[in-house]
C-alpha cells in the first residue's frame, strides 16, 4: 500500500523554542509533527510502508549520520528502518485480528528519533482489514430435539457463527438447506451480533421421519466471499399415537403329542410404531379356561408360547387360545392361536442282544450264527412293526427267526489279517411316520489261524562286507513279516544247511533266530572267496508252522592286506645272493633283468609300481615303474665296479600301501673267464680290517685253479654222457610215451644267466635224482653262481637197465614253445647285433661251449637234488614250490607280462599251441639249427 504523506506543518516558533532549550539546557519535548501511513494486514516481512527520509526531508545517507532510529513504546517491534534507502518496512507478518481484535480502526503508533537534533517524530500506521477469515461455528454438528406433537410456528434458537474480520468482511447472513418442515429466521442482539432461529413450519411425525438433517450456512460480505457450514440434526421425539398390531389375526399350529415339556410351539408378534415406552408391547392370555391355562405358558415380552404340561391326543386334540397385546398407553390388540395335537409314533423300538458268540475263528463256514437278537415296540399297528438292519459292507447278514427274534450269521468269508474285529451296529426301525429306530452296538472279535507264511520285504538280499572283519560282528539283518497274530506271527530265523569249500556254512555265518541279525563267525578273506550265497529261512510258530526262504548274497570286499610277493628273482634258500650279468659294452637302456611280483589283492590294491630304492652306483641303473625292468641308465665305464648291488622296492596302491624289497647283484663283465676269475670277489670278507692282500691272492689263484679243473672234469663227463645218452635213446625208441608233461620239472639254471649254448634238462616229477632226459639242445641263457663251481654232489646217472620203462613209459619230449625262444638280436649283450635269423653263439670257441655244458649238468644235478633256488615243479615255469600247481600264473593273469626269462627281452605268453598240446610252429627248425652248431 502507498503511504500517506505528512499532512502537518512545522511551526517556526517551535523550532526557535527547541534551539532556545538547547542553548539554555532546559528539557525539551517532541515537536507536533505527525507522519501517518496505511497498510493492509498480512503483508510479508520487508514490505514497503513509507519513505521516512523523504518525509523528514533528509537524504538517505543522512539517516545514519544523524542517528535516525525507531523508538519503541514497549510493544513488539512491527516495523524497521532501512538505513540505506530510508524506507520504513514491515519487520514481520501483521495480523490485524490478533493486533486489534474486533476494533473498527486499528492503528500502530511509534516515534522516530533524530539524535543529532534531539528531535522526535510521531509515526502512525493504520492496519486495514482484509477478508482473510471465514465465518466458523464452534461445533461441527448441532443436535436439536423436538417432540413430534409440537405445534407449527415453534422457534428453536441456533448458535451463531463467528467471523474475526470487521466491516464488510465480517458475518453478514445465514442460509438453511431447503426442506418442507423448517425455515430460518435471523435475529440481532443488542450488540449487533446476528444469530439464527429454526422455525417449525409443518407438524412432525416420528413414525414417518425420526431424524431431519439440515445444513446451516454463515456467509460474510468480503471479496472473495467466505462462508462456513454446520450440520443440524433434528431428532423427533415420539408420542404414543399408535396402537399395537399383530402380524397375523389368527395363528395356527399342529404339534405332536409327544413333545416334551418346555417345547416352544410358536411365537406371536405385535408391533407398535411408537418408540420407547410407547412402543413396548406386552402379551397375555385372554379368556382362557384354567385347564388350558396349565397346559401352555406365554412369555409376556417375547410372545413365545411353550408347553408347560404333556399333551395327550386322546385327551384333547384341539386348543383355541386368545392373546392380547398392549402398549405402554391405553392402546391394545387381540389375536387367536389355534393348536392342533397330532397322534405320533412316540415309542422307539427296544433291541436286546440275547447271545453273542465272540470270538469267531476266521475259517468259520458261511452261515455260522454269531449273535441272537430280540426286538419289541410299545406302539401298535404300523407304529409297532419293527425291522432290523446292519451296514451292507459287513460280512454278516440278519435272518428273521421265530416271533421277534433275529439271527446274525456269517455272509462272506472272514480274514483276520484284513479285519481283526468288527464294530457291529444293529438298527431296529418301526413303521411309524416318521419312523423311530434304536441301535445296539457290540464288537465281534475274529480269532486268528495260521494261514499266512512269513514274507520277506525283498525277493533277494545282498550286502557287502570288507574282509578281515571282526569275529562276531553284525554284518546284516533280514526281516520277515507275518500278518498273523501271537504265536502264529512269532518268526524264527535260520540258515539253510550248506557248505563253502567243504566247510559248513554254519562255521562262517550265524543268525539270531529272534531278530534275523547275521553275525560273522570268522574273519573273511577276499583271497579265499569273494562271495557267499546262502538261504535264510523264516518260520512262524503256528501249528503247523509255515515258512519262506530268501536268498542272501554276501560279497566280500577286498582290503589291502597282502604285501606284494616277488616271484623273480626268488629269494634263495641257502642265503646266497642272485647274480645278474651286464656286459660292459651294454648301451643305455640295456635290459639287465626284470623284477616280477604279484599281489594277492585285487583292483587298486594289486596295482604294483617298482622303484629303485638303493644302488651301490647311483645313476647307473633305472627300474621301470610299471614293468619292473632293470635297465642301464647310462653306458658302463671301466671304472664301474664289477659287482653292483641294487635294492628294488615293489609297492601296491592300497590304503595304506604295502611294499616288498629285493636285492639284486649285477656282475659287470664281458666274458665268462672274467666272471669266473672275479667270482671270489662277490663274497665280502668277514673282517675287512684283518684281510691280507696276500691271502686274497692265494685264495683267488686257488679258486681259479679249482674252477678250471672242475670245468675240465665236467666237460669230459658231459661228453661221455652225451655219447651214452644218444646210444640209450636210440635203443629205447619212444620209451617215455604216455608220460604227461606235468611229470617233468624244467631246470632253468642257477641264479646268474650268461649268453651261451645251453641244453634243456628235464626230470620227471617222481624220478628224483635217478632219471634224466636230455632232449635236443636249444639255446638259452644259463645262470652261473659261485655255488655252481663249488657243488660237491656229482651228477649221477643210472645205466640203461635202471630206467623205469615199465613204470613210466618214456615219450618223446615235446619241443620247446616258440614263445620261450628269441633270436640273438632279442638277447641283451653284444650278441644282439648279430643276425637275427639264427640263434647267436655267445661263446667264442669250442672250449667255452664245453665248459657251459658242464655247468648245465651241474645245474641239472642241483635241480635233481631239489637244491636249486630257482627250479620248480612242472608247469611252474621255474617258480618256487609256493607258486606250484596250486598257484600258477593262471591265477594272476594281469601279471603274465611281468614273467621275465632272465638275460633276454622275452616275456611269457600262453601260446595256443602249448594249450592245445601240439608242437609249436618252428620248433623243428630250431632243433636243426642247434644240431648244425653242435656239428661245428
From Swiss-Prot:
<keyword id="KW-0106">Calcium</keyword>
<feature type="glycosylation site" description="N-linked (GlcNAc...) asparagine">
    <location>
        <position position="423"/>
    </location>
</feature>
<dbReference type="Pfam" id="PF00028">
    <property type="entry name" value="Cadherin"/>
</dbReference>
<dbReference type="GO" id="GO:0007155">
    <property type="term" value="P:cell adhesion"/>
</dbReference>
<dbReference type="Pfam" id="PF15974">
    <property type="entry name" value="Cadherin_tail"/>
</dbReference>
<feature type="domain" description="Cadherin 5">
    <location>
        <begin position="457"/>
        <end position="566"/>
    </location>
</feature>
<feature type="region of interest" description="Disordered">
    <location>
        <begin position="801"/>
        <end position="845"/>
    </location>
</feature>
<feature type="compositionally biased region" description="Basic residues">
    <location>
        <begin position="926"/>
        <end position="936"/>
    </location>
</feature>
<feature type="topological domain" description="Extracellular">
    <location>
        <begin position="33"/>
        <end position="696"/>
    </location>
</feature>
<feature type="topological domain" description="Cytoplasmic">
    <location>
        <begin position="718"/>
        <end position="936"/>
    </location>
</feature>
<dbReference type="GO" id="GO:0007399">
    <property type="term" value="P:nervous system development"/>
</dbReference>
<dbReference type="InterPro" id="IPR020894">
    <property type="entry name" value="Cadherin_CS"/>
</dbReference>
<keyword id="KW-1133">Transmembrane helix</keyword>
<feature type="domain" description="Cadherin 4">
    <location>
        <begin position="352"/>
        <end position="456"/>
    </location>
</feature>
<dbReference type="InterPro" id="IPR032455">
    <property type="entry name" value="Cadherin_C"/>
</dbReference>
<dbReference type="GO" id="GO:0007156">
    <property type="term" value="P:homophilic cell adhesion via plasma membrane adhesion molecules"/>
</dbReference>
<dbReference type="InterPro" id="IPR031904">
    <property type="entry name" value="Cadherin_CBD"/>
</dbReference>
<feature type="transmembrane region" description="Helical">
    <location>
        <begin position="697"/>
        <end position="717"/>
    </location>
</feature>
<keyword id="KW-0325">Glycoprotein</keyword>
<feature type="domain" description="Cadherin 1">
    <location>
        <begin position="33"/>
        <end position="137"/>
    </location>
</feature>
<feature type="signal peptide">
    <location>
        <begin position="1"/>
        <end position="32"/>
    </location>
</feature>
<feature type="domain" description="Cadherin 3">
    <location>
        <begin position="247"/>
        <end position="351"/>
    </location>
</feature>
<feature type="domain" description="Cadherin 6">
    <location>
        <begin position="574"/>
        <end position="687"/>
    </location>
</feature>
<keyword id="KW-1003">Cell membrane</keyword>
<dbReference type="Pfam" id="PF16492">
    <property type="entry name" value="Cadherin_C_2"/>
</dbReference>
<feature type="compositionally biased region" description="Polar residues">
    <location>
        <begin position="820"/>
        <end position="845"/>
    </location>
</feature>
<keyword id="KW-0130">Cell adhesion</keyword>
<protein>
    <recommendedName>
        <fullName>Protocadherin gamma-A10</fullName>
    </recommendedName>
</protein>
<dbReference type="InterPro" id="IPR015919">
    <property type="entry name" value="Cadherin-like_sf"/>
</dbReference>
<feature type="region of interest" description="Disordered">
    <location>
        <begin position="906"/>
        <end position="936"/>
    </location>
</feature>
<comment type="function">
    <text>Potential calcium-dependent cell-adhesion protein. May be involved in the establishment and maintenance of specific neuronal connections in the brain.</text>
</comment>
<dbReference type="GO" id="GO:0005886">
    <property type="term" value="C:plasma membrane"/>
</dbReference>
<dbReference type="InterPro" id="IPR050174">
    <property type="entry name" value="Protocadherin/Cadherin-CA"/>
</dbReference>
<dbReference type="InterPro" id="IPR013164">
    <property type="entry name" value="Cadherin_N"/>
</dbReference>
<dbReference type="InterPro" id="IPR002126">
    <property type="entry name" value="Cadherin-like_dom"/>
</dbReference>
<dbReference type="GO" id="GO:0005509">
    <property type="term" value="F:calcium ion binding"/>
</dbReference>
<feature type="glycosylation site" description="N-linked (GlcNAc...) asparagine">
    <location>
        <position position="51"/>
    </location>
</feature>
<keyword id="KW-0472">Membrane</keyword>
<feature type="domain" description="Cadherin 2">
    <location>
        <begin position="138"/>
        <end position="246"/>
    </location>
</feature>
<keyword id="KW-0677">Repeat</keyword>
<dbReference type="Pfam" id="PF08266">
    <property type="entry name" value="Cadherin_2"/>
</dbReference>
<keyword id="KW-0732">Signal</keyword>
Amino acid at each position: 500500500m502507498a503511504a500517506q504523506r505528512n499532512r502537518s506543518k512545522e511551526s517556526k516558533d517551535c523550532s526557535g523554542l527547541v534551539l532556545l532549550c538547547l542553548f539554555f539546557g532546559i528539557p525539551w519535548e517532541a515537536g507536533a509533527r505527525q507522519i501517518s501511513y496505511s497498510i493492509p494486514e498480512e503483508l510479508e516481512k520487508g514490505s514497503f510502508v513509507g519513505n521516512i527520509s523523504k518525509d523528514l526531508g533528509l537524504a538517505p545517507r543522512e539517516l545514519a549520520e544523524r542517528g535516525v532510529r525507531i523508538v519503541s513504546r514497549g510493544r513488539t517491534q512491527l516495523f524497521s528502518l532501512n538505513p540505506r534507502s530510508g524506507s520504513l518496512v514491515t519487520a514481520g507478518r501483521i495480523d490485524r485480528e490478533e493486533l486489534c481484535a474486533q476494533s473498527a480502526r486499528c492503528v500502530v503508533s511509534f516515534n522516530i528519533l533524530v539524535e543529532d537534533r534531539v528531535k522526535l517524530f510521531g509515526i502512525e500506521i493504520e492496519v486495514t482489514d482484509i477478508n482473510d477469515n471465514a465465518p466458523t461455528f464452534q461445533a461441527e454438528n448441532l443436535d436439536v430435539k423436538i417432540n413430534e406433537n409440537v405445534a407449527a410456528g415453534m422457534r428453536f434458537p441456533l448458535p451463531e457463527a463467528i467471523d474475526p474480520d470487521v466491516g464488510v468482511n465480517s458475518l453478514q447472513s445465514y442460509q438453511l438447506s431447503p426442506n418442507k418442515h423448517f425455515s430460518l429466521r435471523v435475529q440481532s442482539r443488542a450488540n449487533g451480533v446476528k444469530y439464527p432461529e429454526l422455525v417449525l413450519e409443518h407438524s412432525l411425525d416420528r413414525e414417518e421421519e425420526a431424524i431431519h438433517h439440515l445444513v446451516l450456512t454463515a456467509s460474510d460480505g468480503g471479496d472473495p466471499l467466505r462462508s462456513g457450514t454446520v450440520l443440524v440434526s433434528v431428532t423427533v421425539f415420539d408420542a404414543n399415537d399408535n396402537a399395537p398390531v399383530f402380524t397375523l389375526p389368527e395363528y395356527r399350529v399342529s404339534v405332536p403329542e409327544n413333545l416334551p415339556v418346555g417345547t416352544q410351539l410358536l411365537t406371536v408378534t405385535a408391533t407398535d410404531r411408537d418408540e420407547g415406552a410407547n412402543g413396548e408391547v406386552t402379551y397375555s392370555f385372554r379368556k382362557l379356561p384354567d385347564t388350558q391355562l396349565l397346559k401352555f405358558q406365554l412369555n409376556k415380552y417375547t410372545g413365545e408360547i411353550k408347553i408347560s404340561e404333556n399333551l395327550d391326543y386322546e385327551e384333547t386334540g384341539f386348543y383355541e387360545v386368545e392373546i392380547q397385546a398392549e402398549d405402554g398407553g391405553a392402546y391394545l390388540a387381540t389375536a387367536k392361536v389355534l393348536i392342533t395335537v397330532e397322534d405320533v409314533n412316540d415309542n422307539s423300538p427296544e433291541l436286546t442282544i440275547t447271545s453273542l458268540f465272540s470270538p469267531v475263528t476266521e475259517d468259520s463256514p458261511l452261515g455260522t450264527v454269531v449273535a441272537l437278537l430280540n426286538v419289541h415296540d410299545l406302539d401298535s399297528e404300523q407304529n409297532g412293526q419293527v425291522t432290523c438292519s446292519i451296514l451292507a459292507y459287513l460280512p454278516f447278514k440278519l435272518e428273521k427267526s421265530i416271533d421277534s427274534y433275529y439271527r446274525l450269521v456269517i455272509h462272506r468269508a472272514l480274514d483276520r489279517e484284513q479285519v481283526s474285529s468288527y464294530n457291529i451296529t444293529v438298527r431296529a426301525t418301526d413303521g411309524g411316520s416318521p419312523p423311530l429306530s434304536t441301535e445296539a452296538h457290540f464288537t465281534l472279535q475274529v480269532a486268528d489261524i495260521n494261514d499266512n507264511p512269513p514274507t520277506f520285504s525283498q525277493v533277494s538280499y545282498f550286502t557287502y562286507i570288507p574282509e578281515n572283519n571282526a569275529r562276531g560282528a553284525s554284518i546284516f539283518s533280514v526281516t520277515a513279516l507275518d500278518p498273523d497274530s501271537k504265536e502264529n506271527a512269532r518268526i524264527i530265523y535260520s540258515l539253510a544247511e550248506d557248505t563253502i569249500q567243504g566247510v559248513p556254512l554254519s562255521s562262517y555265518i550265524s543268525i539270531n533266530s529272534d531278530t534275523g541279525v547275521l553275525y560273522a563267525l570268522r574273519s573273511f578273506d577276499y583271497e579265499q572267496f569273494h562271495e557267499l550265497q546262502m538261504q535264510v529261512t523264516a518260520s512262524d510258530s503256528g501249528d503247523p508252522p509255515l515258512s519262506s526262504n530268501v536268498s542272501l548274497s554276501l560279497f566280500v570286499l577286498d582290503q589291502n592286506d597282502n604285501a606284494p610277493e616277488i616271484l623273480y628273482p626268488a629269494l634263495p634258500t641257502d642265503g646266497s645272493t642272485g647274480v645278474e650279468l651286464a656286459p660292459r659294452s651294454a648301451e643305455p637302456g640295456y635290459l639287465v633283468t626284470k623284477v616280477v611280483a604279484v599281489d594277492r589283492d585285487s583292483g587298486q590294491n594289486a596295482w604294483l609300481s617298482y622303484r629303485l630304492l638303493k644302488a651301490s652306483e647311483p645313476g647307473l641303473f633305472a627300474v621301470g615303474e610299471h614293468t619292473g625292468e632293470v635297465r642301464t641308465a647310462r653306458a658302463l665305464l671301466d671304472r664301474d665296479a664289477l659287482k653292483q648291488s641294487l635294492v628294488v622296492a615293489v609297492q601296491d596302491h592300497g590304503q595304506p600301501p604295502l611294499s616288498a624289497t629285493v636285492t639284486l647283484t649285477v656282475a659287470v663283465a664281458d666274458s665268462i673267464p672274467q666272471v669266473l676269475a672275479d667270482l671270489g670277489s662277490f663274497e665280502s670278507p668277514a673282517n675287512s680290517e684283518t684281510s691280507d692282500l696276500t691271502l686274497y691272492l692265494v685264495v683267488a689263484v686257488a679258486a681259479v685253479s679249482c674252477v678250471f679243473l672242475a670245468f675240465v672234469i665236467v666237460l669230459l663227463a658231459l661228453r661221455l654222457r652225451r655219447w651214452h645218452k644218444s646210444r640209450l635213446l636210440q635203443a629205447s625208441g619212444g620209451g617215455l610215451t604216455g608220460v604227461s608233461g606235468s611229470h617233468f620239472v624244467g631246470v632253468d639254471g642257477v641264479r646268474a644267466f650268461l649268453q651261451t649254448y645251453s641244453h634243456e634238462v628235464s626230470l620227471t616229477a617222481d624220478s628224483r635224482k635217478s632219471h634224466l632226459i636230455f632232449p635236443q639242445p636249444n639255446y638259452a641263457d644259463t645262470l652261473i653262481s659261485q655255488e655252481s663251481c663249488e657243488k660237491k654232489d656229482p651228477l649221477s646217472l643210472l645205466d640203461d637197465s635202471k630206467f623205469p620203462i615199465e613204470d613210466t613209459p618214456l615219450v618223446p619230449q615235446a619241443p620247446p614253445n616258440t614263445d620261450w625262444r628269441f633270436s640273438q638280436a632279442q638277447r641283451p649283450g653284444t650278441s644282439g647285433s648279430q643276425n637275427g635269423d639264427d640263434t647267436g653263439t655267445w661263446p667264442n670257441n669250442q672250449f667255452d661251449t664245453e665248459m657251459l655244458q658242464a655247468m648245465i649238468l651241474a645245474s641239472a644235478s642241483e635241480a635233481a637234488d631239489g637244491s636249486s633256488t630257482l627250479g620248480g615243479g612242472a608247469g611252474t615255469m621255474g617258480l618256487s614250490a609256493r607258486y606250484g600247481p596250486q598257484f600258477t600264473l593262471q591265477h594272476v593273469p594281469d601279471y603274465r607280462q611281468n614273467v621275465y626269462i632272465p638275460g633276454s627281452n622275452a616275456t611269457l605268453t600262453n601260446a595256443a599251441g602249448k594249450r592245445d598240446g601240439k608242437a609249436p610252429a618252428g620248433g623243428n627248425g630250431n632243433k636243426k639249427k642247434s644240431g648244425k652248431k653242435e656239428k661245428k
